[in-house]
Amino acid sequence: DLREYNNPLPKWWLWLFYITVVFGLLYFILYPGLGTWKGIKGWTQASQWEQENAAAEAKVAAYLAPFASMTVPELAANAQAMATANNLFQNNCAQCHGADGGGARGFPNLANSDWQWGGDPDSIVQTIANGRVAAMTPWGEVLGEEGVDAVVAYVQQLSGQQSDPAKAAAGAAHFQTFCMACHGPDGKGMAAVGAPNLTDGVWLYGSDAATLKETVTKGRAGQMPAFQDKLGEQRVRLLAAYVYKLSGGAQ
């Protein structure tokens, strides 16, 4: 016959179960876990992160303190500062400008002397700290296809490329009417408004006729993010010194 036996659980299992229950109750008393109950310790993930981040920032501030009194050119000549700046660059800038600062289509080359917004230390600091918005007006509807082709021919001529002389002559008139306000009457650009030099053979998006036509027709809308809030003043200055050195400014 079948009969029911009384088989108690092992003592160690029972004690482990009791300990688990007690631990759970204590946890929910000390820490948040039940509805809006915040726990008697008042602990949150956010507060723990803030404390740990503050401690880390204090260590960083102590490390960066010797660089605070240096100018950008002095930082560019300091090996320790540049080693730190290289780490900052690889973590914050290389994604767009490349590990060597050589840039890519739509992202400026930082390793040459061609500067859209100015290459002096103050201008570089300003660019990194506050970012830049490089808006090129679309002229397709204003000029029409024939007018766009003429301006493209003239811009190619300005930069030493071969183009149709008749179209270039017509494009020169359009250029003086619509383009010179930003790029200047000679096409050499204006750093104050971020208008690039069209005569030096350095191109952000490309210099072939098709790309130039796209640029003139549709315009461009480049944007450089601001890093002041993310990195703080001292790290921005280190990055400025790194970029300044990349471009040969420290030589």
Residue positions per predicted region:
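Basic, gly/Ser/Thr/Pro-rich low-complexity segments located predominantly at protein N termini
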Residues: 15, 29, 103-106, 136, ...
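Axial heme c-ligation environment in periplasmic c-type cytochrome domains
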Residues: 104-111, 130-148, 152-166, 193-197, ...
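Sequence/structural segment immediately N-terminal to covalent heme-attachment motifs in c-type
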Residues: 77-102, 112, 116-119, 125-130, ...
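Compositionally biased, intrinsically disordered low-complexity regions
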Residues: 26, 35-37, 41-44, 100, ...
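Periplasmic c-type cytochrome electron-transfer domains
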Residues: 1-76, 117-123, 127, 138-156, ...
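Gly/Thr/Ser/Pro-rich low-complexity intrinsically disordered regions
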Residues: 158, 205-206
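A broadly tuned "polar low-complexity/structure-edge" signature
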Residues: 10, 98, 124, 134, ...
